[in-house]
């Protein structure tokens, strides 16, 4: 699928970002459980997730310029160090204001890692295999993210070291990033201006939104899904009488479905068309989400439902990435990845905050209403984008 000399960069970046997935997957539920143990409600959990997302928006805006100036590898190494420190210090800070600042710093550091990593991966394959190559990347990330709640369950029994352990996990991403090859600064800047085939290399942020709204809507949908499931699904399961281990296992099943089904989604997209499969995933999510309150009471079917739900939701994000690589190159691809990350941060901020308020007033099952409205918005955006030309 890739030329031999590209596999080293692909494996290096993918392995590093996958390790970061483990850190993210453990930190979000650990934060939610720690706040709940202190007697704080879901609204505080939602705002804490929103603080990280708000920091992510700032980090996203800075990513393209920082990358062009300092290089991909150097920026990613700096960000890993800051992410690790922001998690470790949660162990020693008691005030909610301190936690809010640390979560914001976490968001600032994580956003460039995903912006740069995803643009890097998306620049490697040709369009004929892009769906499968990007799916390998997202699958690797999600498989490690799946292990996050399991790590949370393990470290929750050692509360005096829990955040220390989760913070140290991020440092495991450093070797892979250090091995990836970064071109000299002059060559990199020239590459960001280069046009490949009919792809847009100079599109502005606004132009990307105009000609490819499904990229933005897909990222927003899965960002909300990701954060809401990590933060609120365990709490919903606990409300239904699940043990802590079973509640966290529900999250694991969701992301196992996400990880397992991504290559299939990529293969289908390469074979039948990226836009068609993208749209089908959105419609499928609209059908599945309203069933969640019913399925939670049916053992066996509940786990199968979560598995399929995770796979369908994950394919929306994977194919948003594929679409950005299919349409854009150079600096425009970096901006498209930045826009995905910015949208992710914005949706991760608004989604959990809104969900926290909704859950506070209407109960845990109401979280599906927030996600269903976003899924409907994605389907409409995809339909709108399919009627517009590839370039403006």
Predicted regions and their residues:
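Cytoplasmic helix-loop-helix junction between adjacent transmembrane helices
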Residues: 104-139
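Helix-to-loop junctions at the C-terminal end of transmembrane segments
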Residues: 59-71, 156, 261-273, 359
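Intracellular juxtamembrane helix-capping segments at the cytosolic ends
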Residues: 112-125, 314-328
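Helix-loop boundary and gating motifs at the non-cytosolic
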Residues: 6-53, 214, 226-236, 247
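Symmetry-related core transmembrane helices of the 12-TM Major Facilitator Superfamily/SLC fold
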Residues: 162-178, 368-383
